[in-house]
């Protein structure tokens, strides 16, 4: 498969990008990767070693993301079992598998690397922006959570947008911890946090991504299903002199 590749060195300056061709040697579905990581299935040594390295890296990336102030809003996925006639026989909710989280963190890393380069070179693209929350909305969130006996973080009486961003992130941490410990409000309480935030959107100017605590963010990893990703591919390749296609300023 033809791809655009970014081998990223953590904490090592501007990333490298180049055109590449990959060969898929293993059919690593999410389910199989999860089974290998859990020790339920064996795979060639190089596959297991690569997966475990990626797992350690994604865990560290996730830790750093939350440490810098990213929101922690996690919702269990809905799963269904069907009977022979196609009807729903059973339904249940389960936490996101480690294999999903692993890929998610690496995708976030790639998206940030591309957006950081484009923003650093002042290149217009379609950035995925998420502006700081409105202080009044965050104050209302804290009041609602308190009414529901959910622990809330301290907040200044008059919050600036920067204060609101920090308090919202701390509230998301407390909500996640409360839900994990009490099993109460697994869907409703994270939804309250999300409703207090600005909606993420696309913009040709880089305005940062508050929810991810990213100074620059874009969608880059799914160009076959999202047009904004394709726009960012074109902008990146044009900026690096790897494309003959004309990209308007």
Regions flagged by a language model, labelled:
Residues 1-249:
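Electropositive polyanion-binding surfaces
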């Amino acid at each position: 498969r033809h791809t655009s590749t970014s081998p990223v060195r953590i904490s090592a300056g501007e990333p490298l990008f180049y055109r590449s061709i990959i060969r898929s040697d293993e059919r690593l579905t999410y389910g199989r990767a999860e089974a290998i990581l859990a020790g339920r299935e064996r795979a060639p040594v190089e596959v297991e070693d690569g997966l475990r390295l990626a797992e350690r890296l994604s865990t560290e990336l996730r830790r750093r993301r939350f440490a810098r102030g990213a929101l922690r809003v996690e919702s269990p996925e809905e799963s269904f079992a069907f009977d022979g006639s196609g009807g729903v026989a059973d339904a249940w909710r389960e936490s996101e598998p480690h294999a999903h989280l692993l890929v998610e963190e690496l995708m976030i890393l790639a998206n940030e690397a591309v957006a950081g380069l484009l923003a650093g070179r002042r290149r217009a693209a379609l950035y995925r922006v998420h502006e700081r929350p409105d202080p009044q909305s965050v104050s209302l969130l804290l009041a609602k959570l308190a009414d529901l006996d959910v622990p809330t973080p301290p907040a200044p009486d008059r919050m600036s947008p920067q204060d609101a961003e920090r308090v919202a992130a701390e509230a998301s941490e407390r909500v996640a911890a409360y839900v994990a410990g009490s099993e109460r409000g697994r869907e409703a309480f994270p939804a309250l946090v999300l409703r207090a935030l600005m909606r993420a959107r696309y913009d040709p100017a880089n305005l940062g991504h508050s929810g991810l605590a990213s100074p620059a963010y874009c969608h880059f990893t799914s160009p076959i299903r999202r047009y904004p990703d394709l726009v960012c591919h074109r902008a990146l390749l044009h900026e690096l002199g790897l494309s003959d296609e004309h990209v308007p300023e």
